[in-house]
């Protein structure tokens, strides 16, 4: 999708490493320690591949998928030991050969309709062996109510980014931000403007979608309680669900 393509350079440079450096110890504690050595892992909405690189370095066999070509271009450079494919979480199809799956950095909040979230869970379940473990994080109501409206600016000599117009509609449950980006390329400034949207799902909606998709046991963990400090952890919950045998 174009909005994620335009955002990929900034995401790769400023956000992916920061988030996944904080998230990886949590994933080790609640999910990775339960997997067999050399497990095959599906990384859904893999972004620029920072998590895939960490997993591959631990000996896991990783397949990443993302809807953005530009994100995947960075992912292939960042994690050459992993495999990547262009696909939408709500419509991909892979054979059930994975031992585990993961989706991080509130990626599943970007699915704006409950039917799309359930479809993503169904697709993930179809890609997992019986008993396979899915780990993911999502932002819940606290995150959108308390910090979503904050503006942000990042200014460097050859690039800048602003986040403005942040809004959360408590009726539709849709949150939006406007991202304006400039990069100095070959002596000329290039501008991109994108709108990024997320949906705030309730814990009940998430658990119901998982159950409908064929997942059983569900464990929930507050990110702050697991050591994810500051805004990264605020209003964020990690989930681990197992596919029914």
Describe each region flagged by the PLM.
Residues 1-37:
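Conserved class I S-adenosyl-L-methionine
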Residues 135-208:
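SAM-dependent methyltransferase
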Residues 93-100:
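A short acidic, Gly/Pro-enriched loop at the edge of an enzyme's catalytic core
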Residues 104-106:
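Residues lining the SAM
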Residues 197-245:
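C-terminal lobe and adjacent flexible extensions of AdoMet/dcAdoMet transferase-like proteins
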């Amino acid at each position: 999708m174009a909005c994620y393509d335009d955002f990929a350079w900034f995401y790769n440079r400023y956000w992916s490493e920061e988030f996944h450096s904080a998230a990886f110890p949590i994933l080790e504690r609640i999910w990775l320690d339960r997997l067999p050595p050399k497990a095959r892992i599906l990384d859904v909405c893999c972004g620029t591949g920072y998590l895939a690189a960490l997993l591959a370095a631990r000996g896991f066999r990783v397949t990443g998928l993302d809807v953005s070509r530009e994100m995947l271009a960075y992912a292939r450079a960042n994690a050459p030991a992993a495999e990547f494919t262009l696909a939408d979480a709500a419509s991909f199809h892979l054979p059930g050969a994975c031992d585990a799956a993961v989706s991080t950095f509130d990626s599943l909040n970007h699915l704006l309709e409950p039917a799309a979230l359930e479809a993503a869970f169904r697709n993930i379940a179809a890609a997992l062996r019986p008993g396979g473990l899915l780990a993911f994080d999502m932002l819940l109501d606290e995150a959108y109510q308390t910090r979503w409206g904050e503006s942000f600016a990042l200014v460097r000599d050859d690039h800048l980014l602003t986040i403005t117009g942040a809004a959360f509609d408590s009726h539709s449950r849709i949150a939006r931000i406007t991202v304006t980006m400039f990069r100095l390329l070959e002596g000329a400034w290039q501008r991109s403007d994108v709108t990024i949207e997320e949906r705030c799902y309730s814990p009940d909606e998430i658990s119901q979608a998982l159950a409908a998709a064929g997942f059983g046991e569900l464990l929930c963990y507050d990110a702050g309680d697991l050591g994810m400090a500051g805004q990264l952890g605020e209003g964020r919950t990690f989930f681990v669900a197992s596919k029914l045998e």
